[in-house]
């Protein structure tokens, strides 16, 4: 005769079934919206708003608008496919309290929170993950308040650079801000990673002009510079804001610009002096008048049915055409610049020109308010830094390699000027003493895995080819040119070592200070992504559970059972 087991034990079949029950996807119990409902209730409680008023800001996968909201700020079509893992929820906050609630509720549900402002993360780390996650889309927090009297502006994280330039233009023709040339880039990512543009040699980095900031920390608190302290303020002005919290906005100092500036573009090919021009550029671009920024574009092309390389100098001079022509006739005769190559215009119009609007003086300024949503192509970017000029034979071999590969191009951005005057630890960005930065760039339109593989391989092959010509120990990279090829972090037992691989490339010796700050402000590593700053382990070496999972403790007949409940369903 069978006897009943003591109540302090659980039979094996029942124990197994109990664990299985707890670990089954919640959709199996017709609760596919449970995560959304739990988040919505939490969000409503934290914001003290009725749920009916916030449903336009919290989107589940079943919401008809979910796909369009997700796609709007995906700027790389490689991550806009049916096989790409989708977020469980997208939050589009419209206030500081919304952001605070989003952080608190995501933390409560133990979901990874990806933070997206403009969506220009080249490898998509602000909106993709291989683990269950939410997206906090900052695009609605876009206010730009310009105060010419104090030469300053408060810029929200979700504003675009085009909107910033337009709002400055509304108030003044002789003020500007030293930031990027792509108008749809979001301020939150651009400034938190350092930020640079075509006035970098005159004024330095964008973050050199940040006077204050607001951030939501891991506890949901809204902190300004005084409240967060100088360490955290330093970290979010070049060290990537998403590792420490959610940046709400920055107060920046505006810079003076002339009423008239000059732009020009000059092209040469291999049979017309391109090698000599590129070689000489290395000794002129980083050392000439700081008012002059000359970007070098190098691209394999077919000309007259012959494969060749085109080298183009695209430039901004903060002054008149006569001045820059006279300057470069002495310093850079290989360029062959003539006055007819130049166009004079306002600084704002030059921003339009750099956005490939060649009729910039005739374009409606409001074009910079257009966010060009859901218009991405496929692409890959990588970066390098050069500390010593590449020899002429190196340029020749580079051109041959680019012709062999077929499509991938290079962009050389000169430093020097103001950049060379600022200490490498003034901000987390450590590359100020380099001659120039290289961007590897390839775009394509075909939605094909095989074609994508080929272009990604081109980027890797050219990157490998350049090893002998670029920085070493570490081989440096620019944080805002996100590149997962240089290392990723799964935030497991080896999190620090994994983070150090890419962290040293991005931040050099500043990485150590960033890790200490991260550990102090977010010891549980809630704010994380595949290339975030890691934390130092606590004394017990404790690790968090995987994102998207929560620990549930149950007692069955006196025995304690620990189970993991999967909260995300696909």
Curated annotation (Swiss-Prot):
PROSITE patterns: FAD_PCMH. It is found in: Secreted; Secreted, Cell wall. It comes from Arabidopsis thaliana. Residues 1-30 form the signal peptide. InterPro entries: BBE, FAD-bd_PCMH, FAD-bd_PCMH-like_sf, FAD-bd_PCMH_sub1, FAD-bd_PCMH_sub2, Oxid_FAD_bind_N. Its cofactor is FAD. Glycans are attached at residues 80, 341, 359. Its EC number is 1.1.1.-, 1.21.-.-. Residues 83-257 form the FAD-binding PCMH-type domain. GO terms for cellular component: apoplast; cytosol; mitochondrion; plant-type cell wall; plasma membrane; plasmodesma; vacuole. Belongs to the oxygen-dependent FAD-linked oxidoreductase family. This is Berberine bridge enzyme-like 19.
């Amino acid at each position: 005769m069978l006897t009943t087991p003591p109540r302090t034990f659980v039979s094996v079949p029942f124990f197994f079934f109990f664990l299985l029950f707890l670990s089954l996807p919640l959709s199996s119990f017709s609760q596919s919206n449970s995560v959304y409902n739990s988040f919505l209730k939490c969000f409503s409680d934290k914001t003290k708003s009725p749920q009916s008023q916030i449903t336009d800001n919290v989107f589940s996968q079943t919401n008809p608008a979910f796909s369009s909201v997700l796609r709007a700020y995906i700027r790389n079509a490689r991550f806009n496919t049916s096989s790409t893992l989708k977020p469980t929820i997208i939050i589009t906050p419209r206030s500081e309290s919304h952001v605070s609630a989003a952080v608190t509720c995501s933390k409560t549900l133990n979901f990874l929170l990806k933070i997206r402002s403009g969506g220009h993360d080249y490898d998509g780390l602000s909106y993709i993950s291989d683990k269950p996650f939410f997206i906090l889309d900052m695009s609605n927090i876009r206010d730009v308040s310009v105060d010419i009297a104090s030469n300053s502006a408060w810029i929200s994280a979700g504003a675009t650079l085009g909107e910033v330039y337009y709002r400055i233009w509304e108030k003044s023709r002789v003020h500007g801000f030293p930031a990027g040339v792509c108008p749809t880039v979001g301020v939150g990512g651009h400034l938190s990673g350092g930020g640079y543009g075509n006035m970098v040699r005159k004024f330095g980095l964008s973050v050199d002009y940040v006077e204050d900031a607001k951030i939501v920390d891991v506890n949901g608190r809204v902190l300004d510079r005084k409240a967060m302290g100088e360490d955290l303020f330093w970290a979010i002005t070049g060290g990537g804001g998403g590792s420490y919290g959610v940046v709400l906005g920055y107060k920046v100092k505006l810079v003076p610009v002339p009423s008239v500036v000059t732009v020009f573009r000059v092209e040469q090919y291999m049979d017309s002096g391109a090698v000599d021009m590129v070689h000489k550029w290395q000794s002129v671009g980083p050392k000439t008048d700081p008012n002059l920024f000359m970007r070098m574009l190098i691209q394999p092309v077919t000309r007259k049915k012959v494969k060749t390389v085109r080298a183009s100098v695209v430039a901004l001079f903060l002054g008149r055409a006569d001045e820059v022509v006279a300057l470069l006739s002495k310093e850079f005769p290989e360029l062959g610049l003539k006055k007819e190559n130049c166009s004079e215009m306002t600084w704002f119009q030059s921003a339009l020109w750099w956005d490939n609007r060649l009729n910039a003086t005739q374009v409606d300024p409001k074009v910079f308010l257009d966010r060009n949503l859901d218009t991405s192509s496929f692409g890959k970017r990588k970066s390098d830094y050069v500390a010593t000029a590449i020899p002429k034979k190196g340029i020749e071999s580079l051109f041959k390699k680019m012709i062999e590969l077929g499509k991938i191009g290079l962009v050389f951005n000169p430093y020097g000027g103001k950049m060379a005057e600022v200490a490498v630890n003034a901000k987390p960005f450590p590359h100020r003493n380099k001659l120039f930065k290289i961007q590897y760039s390839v775009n394509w339109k075909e939605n094909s895995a095989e074609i994508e593989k080929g272009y990604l391989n081109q980027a890797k092959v050219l990157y490998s080819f350049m090893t002998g010509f670029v920085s070493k120990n570490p081989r440096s990279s620019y944080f805002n040119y996100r590149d997962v090829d240089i290392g990723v972090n799964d935030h497991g037992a080896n999190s620090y070592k994994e983070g150090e691989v890419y962290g040293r490339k991005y931040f050099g010796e500043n990485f150590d200070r960033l890790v200490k700050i991260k550990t102090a402000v977010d010891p549980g590593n809630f704010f994380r992504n595949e290339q975030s700053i890691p934390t130092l382990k606590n004394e017990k070496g404790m690790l968090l559970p995987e994102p998207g999972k929560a620990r549930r403790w149950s007692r069955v007949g006196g025995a304690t059972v620990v189970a993991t409940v999967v909260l995300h369903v696909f």
